[in-house]
Amino acid sequence: MSVVSPDPAPVPHDPQRRALLRWLVGGGALAGGLGVSAVAQGYRFGVTHEQWNLVGLTRPVRLALLTDLHYGLYIGAGSVRRWVDATLAECPDLILLGGDLVDSHFDAAARPQQTAALLAELGRLRAPLGVYAVWGNHDYGSFGRSISQSPEASRADWAARRDALRAGLAGQGVTVLLNEGRSLRDDLWLGGVDDLRMGEADSVAALRGSGTRATVLLAHNPDVLLRLRSAPGLVLSGHTHGGQVRLPLLGALKVPADPRFTMGWVRGPQGIPAYVSRGLGMSGLPVRNLCEPEITLLTLLPPGA
């Protein structure tokens, strides 16, 4: 005698369960799509054109500001090549590199080919008034900690890396300014300071000798605006990445500086103007959202022009 199993009981229709499943599947797909988009946004960039009337200037000057390259971990020579090509296409009078040239995980001595590739690309930068750079905290080997918390051997190792990188850059025509300045024209002085947190930033030394010239101070960290002991006509910074990840209505989730100085045109408490670049590279995670990497092409004009 055969036994026929009864049909399984039908699963009751549960609208809430189906809605939850749809939400989970849709939410997962959305999160995945946003993740892919955030990674893609991190590798796109644009050229931002800005103007500023600078006291003391007698004729215009066009400068390009590239900052926060973070070469090494997520950024390779191909990205740097595209940035250099875009910069040269603008034919600036002056090119400035605003620090964090390499990522804190990058060991130049252990990766000589990568280091040579970086120097070769940056060596293509040419401008009538020169190419200048300053150090950022990642050039000190720091990702969010004080240099004083690092072991002595680690600090010595990174000092040697910076010395080697500085010499390599000099060989390619890029001058790193460490609390010093240069007279670029009879009406223009450029000063550059060491990193605010990891080094010893001295704006007075950087602007010493500027006289009556218009003054531009290159400083990686915009928080230098809170500690200035001099009064430059304009400060140019990076460091913040514009927050790197921004959300609609909320803005930046985290800013490694005074939140008043997240990005764009800002003023310090003394009224000194500054432009804070969103930078080009990434740190922490290889993502950006609503915060496109930028090269800033800044035209400085005489007052009233």
Curated annotation (Swiss-Prot):
Residues 1-40 form the signal peptide. Binds 2 divalent metal cations. A divalent metal cation 2 binds at residues 100, 137, 239. Keywords: Hydrolase, Metal-binding, Signal. The keyword Hydrolase applies. The keyword Hydrolase applies. Predicted to be exported by the Tat system. The position of the signal peptide cleavage has not been experimentally proven. InterPro entries: Calcineurin-like_PHP_ApaH (IPR004843), Metallo-depent_PP-like (IPR029052), Metallophosphoesterase_sf (IPR051158), TAT_signal (IPR006311). GO terms for biological process: lipid A biosynthetic process. GO terms for cellular component: membrane. Its cofactor is a divalent metal cation. SUPFAM superfamilies: Metallo-dependent phosphatases (SSF56300). Pfam families: Metallophos. A divalent metal cation 1 binds at residues 68, 70, 100, 241. One of its GO terms (molecular function) is metal ion binding. It comes from the Bacteria. Belongs to the metallophosphoesterase superfamily. This is Uncharacterized metallophosphoesterase DR_2345. It comes from Deinococcus radiodurans (strain ATCC 13939 / DSM 20539 / JCM 16871 / CCUG 27074 / LMG 4051 / NBRC 15346 / NCIMB 9279 / VKM B-1422 / R1).
